[in-house]
Amino acid sequence: MDLELFDDDQLLDDKHHDLIKKLVAFCGKQLKLPENTEMSITLVGDDEIERINREYRETDRVTDVISFAIEEGEDDLPLLPGMAKNIGDLFIDPLTVRRHAEDYGHSFERELGYTVVHGFLHLNGYDHIKPEDEAVMIPLQKKILAAYGLTR
């Protein structure tokens, strides 16, 4: 996995940056994605995540993660052999992640991991709006977190 991680406001320390990078690589292996798969994660604060949520999802509130998947359509050009595939971008608000960790009574690392895996699965076509989709996504999310060692 080729991950671009942006933290212009230094919302997290190097230890947490490393956790994100390692977890994304682990997720890529769990889903058997090609090694040259690309994505980005941008860490933002409450004001920015609320603005993005309002502008792109028409929801005027903060949230922990917003995903923008790059989905292939019939008009897309086929990838050349060895060419990287970009699956999309995540915007994560560590401040909201920290509040969720406190609300749920577990570590910030576990909640950050949950948020990264959850967003990663969305970038790969998983969803949880319909019960039948949720029945696939949530167990996979739990399986990945447990295999990585991030349990409640």
UniProtKB/Swiss-Prot annotation:
Keywords for this protein: Cytoplasm, Endonuclease, Hydrolase, Metal-binding, Nuclease, Ribosome biogenesis, rRNA processing, Zinc
GO CC, any one term: cytoplasm
GO terms classed as biological process: rRNA processing
Cofactor: Zn(2+)
Binding site for Zn(2+): 118, 122, 128
UniProt key word Coiled coil: no
Function (record text): Single strand-specific metallo-endoribonuclease involved in late-stage 70S ribosome quality control and in maturation of the 3' terminus of the 16S rRNA.
Similarity section: Belongs to the endoribonuclease YbeY family.
PANTHER family: ENDORIBONUCLEASE YBEY, CHLOROPLASTIC (PTHR46986:SF1)
Name of the protein in question: Endoribonuclease YbeY
Source species: Lacticaseibacillus paracasei (strain ATCC 334 / BCRC 17002 / CCUG 31169 / CIP 107868 / KCTC 3260 / NRRL B-441) (Lactobacillus paracasei)
Lineage: Bacteria, Bacillati, Bacillota, Bacilli, Lactobacillales
Protein encoded by which gene: ybeY
